[in-house]
């Protein structure tokens, strides 16, 4: 039996941990009485122990989340914050016991008013004092924008900024040391919100991680809407079934997979891929379930073409080849894209009965002229953010089935041209990484595990985690040259099959050998 003297250090450590937990819990329980901020109504303050599977009964059904596992002890604060006389945001702050002195805001997705609880859990678990809001409305529909410009303004820019202002005040109030640096993490609409902060609120964040950004958003809505005019409805002679999209994908890989030097099912640089589809056009007498008709081949060519406006100006770049299988069930499914339909019905034309099947580029011109509250988020002069010392890191999956990765390249070029700076100077504050094999924000056939979300988490090493890479860049001045991604053997959370270092744009990955394509050292950024 061990002596009492030997046990004393362990007993003392255990007692200290329990005391710390009790102190944190007590501090959280009494925190509501200390909150007295303008326009803020506290709904509740709860202590949530690590390991809790938190029930979310008030989360809108369309948001799809009924519970969230919380990894670390947090103080959860739920609030309503007025943004005008007729609008408010629902805001949550998760303040962790393992606080690292860092503040972080999360974003949203689509047109949705859904707090992304998985991001709150992920980032608070890493020690960030984290906030997340519903962007001023509840659910995934665009209907709340109908005749409510204040709600729309919340969605465009005010929700995230308001959450940052309130969240920073709460962080200073709860932790004696306040916060030393502030960060942003978001993807899709969350990526657009990140760039809106860079463009409009340059002092809100020291570091912004903005994935697959939905900037150029008015034209994105039009681009998404125009696919129906190309495919037609299910059963039309221009429509491709999912099986035919699989056949098309195999042909695209046959033509383009080896361009990067390795035939691994991943196209490292889709901009080099211009598939010629004559090879799979049906021969006389051939079963049309195994090949494309001439009209179907034309459909594919149109999908892989940019969208131009009524005067011939570029509105939105092409969809990148390689994404077609995943996109076929969402963008090319023979139905108008729902977000686009909502946008035109409830905002552009303020007519819930507007027929989305009749969309044309003339509608795109009407929408772009409106651009309410500058939803476009396409301003290319981000010099104020640079002067404030901010860093922005953006990434985009090259299998993205919802937002073309070409659009992120287009914005990068716009910034370089507008600010008159070459890539090596942009690198000082703005870095862009193309993630081969990544679909929209997560998933895909390649090494998409970069730590941008809980579902893509591998570890917290800055080389393997895009958020912690940003922290290292901001706090230590070590900028990331590559972002290592993990390919999981059986989807998220499974073992790592292989890793690949994704290159900083404008470099691209090329297989040099001599190892297998699963060897990250067999690839080189050129």
Swiss-Prot record:
GO molecular function: feruloyl esterase activity; metal ion binding
Active site: 188, 400, 440
InterPro entries hit by this protein: AB_hydrolase_fold (IPR029058), Tannase/feruloyl_esterase (IPR011118)
Reaction(s) catalysed (UniProt annotation): feruloyl-polysaccharide + H2O = ferulate + polysaccharide
E.C. numbers: 3.1.1.73
Glycan attachment points: 53, 85, 98, 138, 246, 287, 311, 490, 516
Compartment list: Secreted
Pfam families according to UniProt: Tannase (PF07519)
Function text: Involved in degradation of plant cell walls. Hydrolyzes the feruloyl-arabinose ester bond in arabinoxylans as well as the feruloyl-galactose and feruloyl-arabinose ester bonds in pectin.
Family: Belongs to the tannase family.
Protein name, entry field: Probable feruloyl esterase B-2
């Amino acid at each position: 039996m061990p002596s009492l003297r030997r046990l004393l250090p362990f007993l003392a450590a255990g007692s200290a941990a329990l005391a710390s937990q009790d102190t944190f819990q007590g501090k959280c329980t009494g925190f509501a009485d200390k909150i007295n901020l303008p326009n803020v109504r506290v709904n509740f303050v709860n202590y949530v122990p690590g390991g809790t599977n938190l029930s979310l009964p008030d989360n809108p059904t369309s948001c799809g989340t009924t519970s969230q596992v919380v990894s670390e002890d947090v103080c959860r604060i739920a609030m309503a914050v007025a943004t005008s006389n007729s609008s408010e945001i629902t805001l949550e702050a998760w303040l962790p016991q393992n606080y690292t002195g860092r503040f972080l805001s999360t974003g949203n997705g689509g047109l949705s008013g859904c707090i992304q609880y998985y991001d709150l859990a992920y980032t608070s678990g890493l020690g960030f004092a984290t906030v997340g809001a519903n962007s001023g409305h509840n659910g995934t529909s665009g209907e709340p924008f109908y005749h409510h410009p204040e709600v729309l303004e919340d969605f465009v820019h005010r929700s995230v900024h308001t959450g940052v202002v309130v969240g920073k005040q709460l962080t200073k109030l709860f932790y004696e040391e306040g916060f030393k640096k502030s960060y942003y993490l978001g993807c899709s609409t969350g990526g657009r919100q990140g760039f809106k902060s860079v463009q409009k609120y340059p002092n809100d964040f020291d570091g912004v991680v903005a994935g697959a950004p939905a900037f150029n958003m008015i034209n994105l809505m039009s681009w998404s809407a125009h696919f129906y005019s190309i495919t037609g409805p299910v059963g039309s002679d221009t429509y491709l079934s999912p099986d035919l999209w699989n056949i098309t994908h195999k042909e695209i890989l046959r033509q383009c997979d080896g361009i990067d030097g390795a035939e691994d099912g991943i196209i490292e640089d889709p901009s080099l891929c211009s598939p010629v589809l004559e090879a799979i056009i049906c021969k006389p007498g051939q079963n049309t379930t195994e090949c494309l008709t001439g009209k179907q081949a034309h459909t594919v060519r149109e999908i892989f073409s940019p969208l131009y406006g009524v005067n011939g100006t570029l509105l939105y770049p092409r969809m990148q080849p390689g994404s077609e299988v995943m996109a076929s069930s969402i963008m090319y499914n023979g139905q108008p894209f729902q977000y686009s339909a909502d946008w035109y019905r409830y905002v552009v034309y303020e007519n819930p009965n507007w027929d989305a099947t009749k969309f044309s580029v003339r509608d795109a011109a009407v929408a772009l002229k409106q651009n309410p509250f500058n939803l476009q988020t396409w301003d290319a002069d981000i010099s104020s953010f640079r002067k404030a010392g901010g860093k922005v890191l953006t990434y985009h999956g090259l299998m993205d089935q919802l937002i073309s990765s070409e659009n992120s390249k287009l914005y990068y070029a716009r910034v370089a041209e507008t600010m008159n700076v070459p890539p090596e100077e942009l690198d000082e504050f703005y870095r862009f990484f193309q993630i081969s094999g990544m679909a929209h924000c997560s998933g895909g056939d390649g090494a998409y595990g970069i730590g941008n979300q809980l579902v893509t988490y591998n570890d917290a090493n800055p080389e393997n985690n895009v958020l912690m890479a940003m922290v290292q860049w901001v706090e230590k001045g070590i900028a990331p040259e590559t972002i290592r991604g993990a390919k999981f053997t059986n989807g998220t959370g499974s073992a790592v099959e292989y890793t690949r270092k994704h290159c900083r744009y404008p470099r691209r990955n090329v297989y040099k050998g001599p190892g297998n394509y699963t060897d990250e050292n067999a690839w080189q950024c050129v």
